[in-house]
Amino acid sequence: MLIETRKLSKIYRVGVERIHALRSVDLNVGDNEMVAIMGSSGSGKSTLMNMIGCLDRPTSGTYLLDGHDVSRMGPAELAKVRNEQVGFVFQSFELLPRQDALQNVELPLIYSGSSKGWGSRRRRAREALARVGLSDRIRHRPNQLSGGQKQRVAIARAILNEPRILMADEPTGNLDSGTTTEILELFRQLHEEGQTVLIVTHEDEVAACCQRVIRLRDGEIASDKPVAEDIAGQSARGDQLSC
C-alpha cells in the first residue's frame, strides 16, 4: 500500500480552544490510484492533504508512505520526502513572476541541491514541459500565459522529480469550464502513465473524473466509494455529474 494512515488526528489550538481538524482517520491509497478528496470548508480535506504531503505533522496517529513511518521522521527527512516523493499543484499556480516557464519548472532540482549540472536540469525541465504540451511556451513568463497554461507549468514542475504521489489542491478553481476539462484530461493521462493522483476539490464534476471519491465531514471520513457509486448517490439527490 502506498499511503496508509491509522487513527490520524490533528488538533489546532486557538487560544484556549481546541479545534479537531482530523479525527482518527483511517485511509489506504494504493499505487496508481486516482482519488478525489472532498468536503465543505472546514471538513478537514486540506489538513489531510497537508498530512499526506508531509507539510504538517499529525497530533496523533500513524502515517506510512510506502511502508515508511513518516510521522516519526525529522525535518530533514521530511524535506527529502516532500521533494522526491510528492509533487504539489495549487489553485493559485505559485509561479515566480520574473521567471519563465522553464526556470519555474527547474526549481525543485535547484532547491534540492541536486548534483546534476545545468544542462541536465534544463533537459529534464524541457521534457516535463513537453509532457504537458508546452514545448512552445518555455520562454514565456507567467503574465504571458493563460490560466490553463500556468497550471500546466505548475503540473510540469510537480512531476519533474517523478514523485510517487501527485497532489492537487483545487487545481481547477481559477479556470473556466473549457480549461478545466483540458487540465482534468492531463491528470487522467498522467494517471494512465502510472502516476498516483490525489485531487482535493469541492467540485463534483472534478471528482467524477477520478476512480474513487473520499468525502470528509467534521474531520472524519463520511464516505469512501468507487466513483460510480458516489455519482449514483449524488444523482439520487438530483445532481447531474459527468466527466
Please report, for each region that a protein language model flagged, where it lies by residue.
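Conserved beta-strand-loop-alpha-helix hinge in the C-terminal portion
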Residues: 220-243
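ABC family nucleotide-binding domain
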Residues: 2-216
